[in-house]
Curated annotation (Swiss-Prot):
Record protein name field: Valine--tRNA ligase
EC number of this enzyme: 6.1.1.9
HAMAP family, per database record: Val_tRNA_synth_type1
Protein species of origin: Streptococcus agalactiae serotype Ia (strain ATCC 27591 / A909 / CDC SS700)
UniProt record, GO biological process: valyl-tRNA aminoacylation
GO cellular component entries: cytosol
Class of enzymatic activity (EC top level): ligase
GO molecular function, one term: valine-tRNA ligase activity
Length: 884
């Protein structure tokens, strides 16, 4: 057990050194219990490009909540950590750092440049691990992986070679998305389309015989030097007689043919289309059909090459302006038509992507996608939370294109293909024997290796590896909806292809962290929040509580410091409650408390408030567990908050003072037992969300770590509807008197007369038996509880279930104001009656809802009607008094 709780909650003091203690105790490693059911999560590996942001904090907090709860529930848990090499992103960061020193990667060469990238990786991996520690993540570092580990690299090579041998990987020359800044190919989903201001440039291409001109339009006039034809529709009567003739390409005066192709739409524009096979995917297809040459007029950095004549060496956008000016001077520019259009931008560098003819490696997706789609109709399907994201996944799989997987980078998994001077190619896991072979210089798309993460980290391709046999498939993946296409989909089809199993049973999809105004956090807006700054001010537990309490599967969360203040205040409340309980504990042990609580629920000792709080605790355990199982952490948090703050702190702890300040030592022991037991259960329920503060408080009264403590379970013996109903009525009575006092500004310290009228004999007896609580909380001069009470003429009236409460305040009561208050009360009951009546008149609800749910609504209707009628009666009485 640790030192006594300090008078004030100080998160920095509570959290300091705690994480290292957990690591030293090895509490995050799997239990190794062969009888326990395995539960595994692989962390979505963060990129080693920099520090973690608030989105990472949210993502990992949700995972930690899940794994900590499962660990406490007795599962053999593994949360496997690791990081992603993030090819293009990391290489860009390192190149940026080198540029600041006046160095390029080409100055260093591949080997020395990669040394620099590894240095970067080591630096930022250490930073990320430090951040994980401050967040309190219960990962097993003995199994930490990196996507460029030798083990994972072996898996990558095997998958590539096997897919190649199965015909699912091929190499070819096609139009791809090209990033001129990173000088690499991009897959379709690495391209972000943005609406930008642009223009259609209309140009005249003169027939070779000079008899007429054909008007064509393009948004990219700088590519005209790659034009190899113009196309017209074969059924277009305007141009039928021109098919087979030539037009002259302006500026360079090159003749190109007029071809007939259905790609040309007679209804669009002039019906004439320039064909540039090396710079447009549609034109590439036309070129293939007509056996046209492919003329590339750009360098890999987005500058024009020597085929662009006088524009050689110019940036593509500068060349665009210059080409248009030249066309105008030659009389070939017809008009410029301004418009807004969608233009692809690189997700990583932000530059405009260039469609470019290039030799690349591709994954053939049709069969792999079909397998993934078919799996969703089996028992082995992946469950999405919320379910709507299954539709997102299926839609993408049904419309997927072949995946370009080669990248013109140095940082990454080098493609396991070799070429020799004879033009031969060898694909294998190991280099070919003999001399004269050169390995393909390209590397694989980062997502290619990430797609293998759930099984490659477990030891695959060794299917006999202990972790692979024990923890794969994994249990749950937690990730954002923004990478369903990039990552989730690819993990599913790769896992099915190579293991025959789904990679995970469940996918919990969360949204994005936004600022208070609902804007996405970004560098350009300057609204990003460093989670470490938040932790420094509020502590990790407060941040984790905010992130979990605001969570609903699939929904975004708005960050605000006001909410962080509320989170800190809640933990401070827990701290103060704990101090009160432990200061009054008098050496009571948890085992002794459990024994006494068992006697309480069996009605051998204790009072009704003890049984009430234990009943409510039991209900809370059930509801929290149920919502955790559905990943509804926000709902679970709301339930916990209400129980801890409202029911336990505001009511039960206050009610116990009636006993703790008395001279009855036997009752004190029972009350202390219920307090300690309930606190212990609360801390266990909270621990997955607030690991640091719960460990600190737990250490005051228990041995060992709360990390390995058992999670609360529903106990049927705790259920006590009689105690629940009675104390809820008691609370309603006390609350009603307090509210009435406040309405007429009668100080709580001033004694008043309280009359409680009830025709319910059981309720009357209950109120009388527990009148000590009523007196303690309402300070009456006189308290009368009876069915024979006659309502005083001038009295504040309130109606609770089963009783009417009158406060004779003749000298203070304004009849007009009391009437207004009662009218407002009447409107409230009318609204409640309308709502429940509407629900009960819905035949579908009555037919389909559970009988107990329908009965609950009927009970509400009866209760509201009673309150409505009583309020009507009281209004009539007050009107009569007013008229008199």
């Amino acid at each position: 057990m640790s030192k006594e709780l300090s008078p004030k909650y100080n998160p920095a003091e509570v959290e300091a050194g705690r994480y290292q203690t957990w690591l030293d105790q090895d509490v995050f490693k799997p239990s190794g219990d062969a009888e326990a059911k395995p539960y595994s999560i692989v962390i979505p590996p963060p990129n080693v490009t920099g520090k973690l942001h608030l989105g990472h904090a949210w993502d990992t907090t949700l995972q930690d909540i899940i794994i900590r709860q499962k660990r406490m529930q007795g599962f053999d848990t593994l949360w496997l950590p690791g990081m992603d090499h993030a090819g293009i992103a990391t290489q860009a960061k390192v190149e940026e750092r080198l540029r600041e020193q006046g160095i390029s990667r080409y100055d260093l060469g591949r080997e020395k440049f990669l040394d620099k990238v590894w240095e970067w990786k080591d630096e930022y991996a250490a930073t990320i691990k430090s951040q994980w520690g401050k967040m309190g993540l219960s990962v097993d570092y003995s199994r930490e992986r990196f996507t460029l580990d030798e083990g994972l690299s072996k898996a990558v090579r095997k998958v590539f070679v096997d897919l190649y041998n199965r015909g699912w990987i091929y190499r070819g020359e096609f139009i791809i998305n090209w990033d001129p800044a990173a000088r690499t190919a991009l897959s379709d989903i690495e391209v972000i389309h943005k609406d930008v201001e642009g223009a259609f440039y209309h140009m005249n291409y003169m027939l070779e015989d000079g008899s007429r001109a054909l008007e064509v339009a393009t948004t990219r006039p700088e590519t005209m030097f790659g034009d190899v034809a113009v196309a017209v529709n074969p059924e277009d009567p305007r141009y039928k007689d021109l098919i087979g003739q030539n037009v002259i390409l302006p500026i360079i005066n090159k003749p190109i043919p007029i071809v007939a192709d259905e790609h040309a739409d007679p209804e669009f524009g002039t019906g004439v289309v320039k064909i540039t096979p090396a710079h447009d995917p549609n034109d590439f297809a036309v070129g293939q059909r007509h056996n046209l040459p492919q003329v590339n007029v750009m360098n890999d950095d987005g500058t024009m090459n020597e085929l662009a004549d006088e524009f050689n060496g110019m940036d593509r956008f500068e060349a665009r302006k210059a080409v248009v000016a030249k066309l105008e001077s030659l009389g070939n520019l017809v008009k410029i038509e301004k418009m807004t259009h969608s233009v692809g931008h690189s997700e990583r560098t932000g530059v405009v992507v260039e469609p470019r003819l290039s030799t690349q490696w591709f994954v053939k997706m049709d069969q792999l996608a079909k397998n993934a789609i078919a799996n969703q109709d089996t028992e082995d399907k992946v469950e999405f939370y919320p379910p709507r994201f299954n539709d997102t996944f299926m839609s993408w799989m049904e419309n997927v294109h072949d995946w370009v997987i080669s990248r013109q980078l140095w940082w990454g998994h080098q493609i396991p293909a070799w070429y020799n001077v004879n033009g031969e190619m060898y694909v294998g896991e190991d280099a070919p024997e003999g001399d004269g072979w050169t390995q393909d210089e390209d590397v694989l798309d980062t997502w290619f290796s990430s797609a293998l993460w759930p099984f490659s980290t477990m030891g695959w391709p060794d299917t006999e590896a202990a972790d692979f046999k024990r923890y794969f498939p994994t249990s749950t993946l937690v990730t954002g909806y923004d990478i369903i296409f990039f990552w989730v989909s690819r993990m599913i089809f790769q896992s099915l292809e190579f293991t025959g199993r789904q990679p995970f049973s469940n996918v919990l999809i969360h949204g994005l962290i936004r600022d208070e105004e609902g804007r996405k956090m970004s560098k350009s807006l300057g609204n990003g929040i460093d989670p470490m700054d938040v932790i420094e001010k509020y502590g990790a537990d407060a941040l984790r509580w905010f992130l979990s309490n605001g969570s609903a599967p699939g929904q975004d969360v708005r960050f605000s410091y006001e909410k962080m203040d509320a989170s800190w205040n809640f933990i401070n409340k827990i701290w103060n409650i704990s101090r009160y309980i432990l200061m009054n504990n008098e050496g009571l042990t948890l085992d002794q408390a459990r024994e006494n609580v068992e006697k309480v629920v069996n009605s051998q000792v204790g009072n009704v408030t003890d049984r009430w709080i234990l009943h409510n605790l039991n209900e809370t355990v059930g509801k929290v567990t149920e919502n955790f199982d559905k990943f509804e952490f926000g709902v679970a948090g709301h339930i916990l908050y209400n129980f801890i703050w409202e029911e336990f702190a505001n009511w039960y702890v206050e009610l116990t003072k009636e006993v703790l300040y008395s001279d009855n030592e036997d009752e004190k022991v029972v009350t202390r037992s219920v307090l300690l037991y309930t606190l212990d259960q609360i801390l266990r329920l909270l621990h997955p969300i607030m690991p640091f503060v719960t460990e600190e408080i737990f250490g005051q009264y228990a041995e060992g770590s709360i990390v390995l403590a058992s999670y609360p379970q529903v106990n049927a013996t705790f259920e006590n509807q009689t105690a629940h109903k009675g104390v809820e009525s008691l609370k309603d009575l006390i609350r009603s008197v307090r509210n009435s006092r406040a309405e007429v500004n009668v100080a709580p310290s001033k004694p008043i007369t309280i009359l409680v009228k009830t025709s319910d004999s059981e309720l009357e007896s209950f109120f009388k038996d527990n009148s000590n609580y009523i007196k303690r909380f309402t300070n009456p001069e006189t308290l009368e509880i009876s069915s024979a009470i006659t309502a005083p003429e001038l009295a504040m009236t309130s109606i609770i279930t089963g009783a009417e409460i009158f406060l004779p305040l003749a000298d203070l009561l304004n009849v007009e104001e009391e009437l207004a208050r009662l009218e407002k009360e009447l409107a409230k009951w009318q609204k409640e009656l309308n709502m429940v009546g509407k629900k009960l008149s819905n035949e579908r609800f009555v037919a389909n809802a559970k009988p107990e749910v329908v009965q609950k609504e009927k009970d509400k209707q009866t209760d509201y009607q009673t309150k409505y009628d009583a309020t009507i009666a009281r209004i009539e009485e007050m009107k009569k008094i007013n008229n008199d």
